[in-house]
C-alpha cells in the first residue's frame, strides 16, 4: 500500500484530499516536515499501518531545505512512495480564500503570497508523481480523482436496517422508507408470531402484483439515492425501512433489498425491533 505525501498550494484542496485518503483507510499526519517522513514510516511499520499519508506544504517552509534528501532516503525504503501535488489558478485560489476568510500561511497580500508559495513549493512539485489542477473541480470530483489517480478502490456500503414506527425511526438514517401499505402478516394468526425472515411471511407480504410493483419502485429509488451518494464521493449510505412494529414487513423488504442490491455493497446491518414482539 502506498505512502503518500500530499502537498500543494493553499486553497487547492489539500484538506479534501486528506479527508478522502482518511476515509479510504489511511493514517493521516498533517503538516509534517520532510525530515520526519522516515520516522513516520518507521512508526507506521512498527504499528502495522499499511496506508499512510502525510502533508507537507508552505506551513513547513522552514524545513524544506531537507526536502530532496528526505525524499531520496524514503524512496529507497518505500518503492510505493507517491507525491501528490494540488494546484489551481491564482484567481480561483483568491476566490476560495475570500469565501473562507482565512489568512494565508505566508501572511502577505494574497496574490503575492500565491506567487511566493508557487516558488517555495516548486521543488516539491518537481518530485510529484501526480499533479492535479483543481481549478474546475468540485470537492466530490477531487475526491474521485485522488482515488482514481492513486488506483485506490473506493469501497461503498449500502446499510439496510428495519424498524417499527411505534418504536420511533432511527436517527442516523440517510433515507427512511415507510412500507406500512404492504399486506400485514400480523392479522394472519399463524404468521403473527413469525418474522419477515421466514419465506411464508415474505410470501404474504409480496403476495400480489400491487405489492410487487411497490417493492420495485422502492428498490429503484434506493438504487438511485445510493448511487447518487456514491457518485458524490460518499463511502456509505443508510436506508431505514419501517413498518408498524418492525417484525414482518420491514424485515422482509430489507432482506429482499439486500439480495437485489449486492452491486452497491448492500447488507442488512440490523433488524432493530424484530424481537420486540409487538408485530405489525
From Swiss-Prot:
GO terms for molecular function: ATP binding; GTP binding. InterPro entries: P-loop_NTPase, RapZ-like, RapZ-like_N, RapZ_C. Keywords: ATP-binding, GTP-binding, Nucleotide-binding. Transmembrane segments: none annotated. PANTHER family: RNASE ADAPTER PROTEIN RAPZ. Displays ATPase and GTPase activities. This is Nucleotide-binding protein Dgeo_0723. It comes from Deinococcus geothermalis (strain DSM 11300 / CIP 105573 / AG-3a).
Amino acid at each position: 500500500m502506498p505512502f503518500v505525501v500530499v502537498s500543494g498550494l493553499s486553497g487547492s484542496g489539500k484538506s479534501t484530499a486528506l479527508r478522502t485518503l482518511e476515509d479510504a483507510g489511511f493514517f493521516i499526519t498533517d503538516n509534517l516536515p520532510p525530515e520526519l517522513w522516515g520516522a513516520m514510516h518507521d512508526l507506521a511499520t512498527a504499528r502495522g499501518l499499511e496506508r499512510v499519508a502525510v502533508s507537507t506544504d508552505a506551513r513547513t517552509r522552514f524545513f524544506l531545505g531537507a526536502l530532496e534528501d528526505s525524499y531520496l532516503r524514503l524512496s529507497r525504503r518505500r518503492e510505493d512512495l507517491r507525491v501528490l501535488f494540488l494546484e489551481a489558478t491564482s484567481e480561483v485560489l483568491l476566490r476560495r480564500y475570500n469565501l473562507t476568510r482565512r489568512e494565508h500561511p505566508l501572511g502577505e497580500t494574497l496574490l503575492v503570497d500565491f506567487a511566493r508559495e508557487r516558488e517555495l513549493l516548486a521543488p516539491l512539485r518537481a518530485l510529484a508523481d501526480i499533479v492535479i489542477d483543481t481549478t474546475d473541480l468540485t470537492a466530490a470530483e477531487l475526491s474521485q480523482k485522488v482515488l482514481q489517480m492513486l488506483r485506490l478502490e473506493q469501497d461503498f456500503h449500502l446499510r439496510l436496517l428495519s424498524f417499527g414506527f411505534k418504536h420511533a425511526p432511527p436517527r442516523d438514517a440517510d433515507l427512511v422508507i415507510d412500507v406500512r401499505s404492504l399486506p400485514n402478516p400480523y392479522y394472519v394468526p399463524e404468521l403473527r408470531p413469525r418474522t419477515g425472515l421466514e419465506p411464508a411471511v415474505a410470501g404474504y407480504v409480496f403476495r400480489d402484483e400491487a405489492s410487487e410493483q411497490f417493492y420495485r419502485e422502492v428498490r429503484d429509488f434506493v438504487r438511485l439515492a445510493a448511487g447518487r451518494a456514491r457518485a458524490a464521493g460518499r463511502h456509505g449510505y443508510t436506508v431505514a425501512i419501517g413498518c408498524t412494529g418492525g417484525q414482518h414487513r420491514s424485515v422482509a423488504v430489507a432482506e429482499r433489498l439486500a439480495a437485489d442490491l449486492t452491486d452497491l455493497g448492500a447488507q442488512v446491518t440490523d433488524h432493530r425491533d424484530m424481537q420486540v414482539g409487538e408485530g405489525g
